[in-house]
Amino acid sequence: MDKRIPSADAAIRNLRDGATILMGGFGLCGIPENLIAAVRRQGTKDLTVVSNNAGVDEFGIGLLLQQRQVKKMVSTYVGENKLFEQLVARGELQLELNPQGTFAERIRAGGAGIPAFFTPTGYGTMVAEGKETREFDGWQYVLERGIRGDFAFVKAWKGDRWGNLIYRKTARNFNPMMATAADYVIAEVEELVELGELDPDKVHTPGIYVNAIFQGQGYEKRIERRTTARI
């Protein structure tokens, strides 16, 4: 089945206000840049975005925060985005903060059809407030629910028209598991190749998980925090 779509704008034509979107990426690495830009252009609002972090003020999810298109963020680290901090402090943005390992497992569980699981991480802290706790073998555990989305936006290095994807190094991050945990998965790739060009043993996301794929453009290597030393 040919899953190619001509552009990011065409790929999100069914995205509606109030949707929950899983967005791959770690820092500024492996984020679906073209899809985020398309959402900004389309103006879709009241979104719940599930992503490791919220980008920076002028890039990534930060572009959607500027337009007040995001209602709620489910994240692990948001310290690089000043606007994010301001919106949360003013009560204009809901935040569900997760330990990073718990965040990853919640998405994996959602993709595996597991509704909830117990973890010791976060017990006795603010992330456990309002959640069921239980003791197992003398240890206290917190109940966490699996995460699923209406959409998942993933960014891959290479892909083919059937939706098979290969990620590159750190850019893999949360993308593969997010591709399993949404009703509709859109992949943007740096290079769209012909069938047979991808080594099956190196495919990270099988095409069965992907609904639409397109070749992105204008990718820019961003550095989130530059550290230099005088020698």
Feature map (PLM): residue ranges:
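Conserved alpha/beta enzyme-core scaffold
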Residues: 1-231
